[in-house]
Regions:
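Rhodanese-like catalytic fold shared by cysteine-dependent sulfurtransferases
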Residues: 2-40, 47, 55-89, 98-129
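Short, surface-exposed ligand- or partner-binding patches at beta-edge/loop junctions that are enriched
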Residues: 93
Length: 129
């Protein structure tokens, strides 16, 4: 009987762990490599590019044609809604990919289709060199 209980507990732990991993992966947006991101943003008819870094970071260098909405601003969602169309996907990036992943989650909740740059502009710059 103890073997059955232990087996049931182990099975329950595996099921919960698998669910947690799947929930983490299914964030509502896609994260892509710099190479794939470059292909995606080339289609400006269907994609809009969003930089969610600070103004200072943006001014130090950004991907051409990127709109700026600072993720740390108190009204990020309002600014994003004012600048972005829900008719086009949003390709989002930041410095390292963390901020843009958080921004992507917020944008998905607002109804946008979102593509996140894995590794941010740092990975983008490494891929271009």
């Amino acid at each position: 009987m103890n073997t059955k209980i232990i087996l049931a507990v182990v099975l329950a732990i595996i099921v919960v762990a698998a669910w947690a991993v799947n929930a983490h992966r299914n964030k509502g947006f896609k994260t892509v490599s710099p190479e794939e991101f470059g292909q995606i943003i080339g289609d400006t008819a269907t994609v809009q590019l969003l930089d969610v870094r600070t103004k200072e970071e943006y001014e130090e260098g950004h991907i051409a044609d990127a709109l700026l909405v600072d993720f740390y601003s108190y009204n990020f969602e309002e600014q994003a809604a004012a600048k972005l169309s829900k008719e086009k996907a949003v390709a989002v990036y930041c410095r390292s990919g963390r901020r843009s992943a958080s921004a992507a989650q917020k944008l998905v909740k607002l109804g946008y289709e979102v593509i996140n740059l894995d590794g941010g502009i740092l990975a983008w710059q490494r891929a271009k060199n």
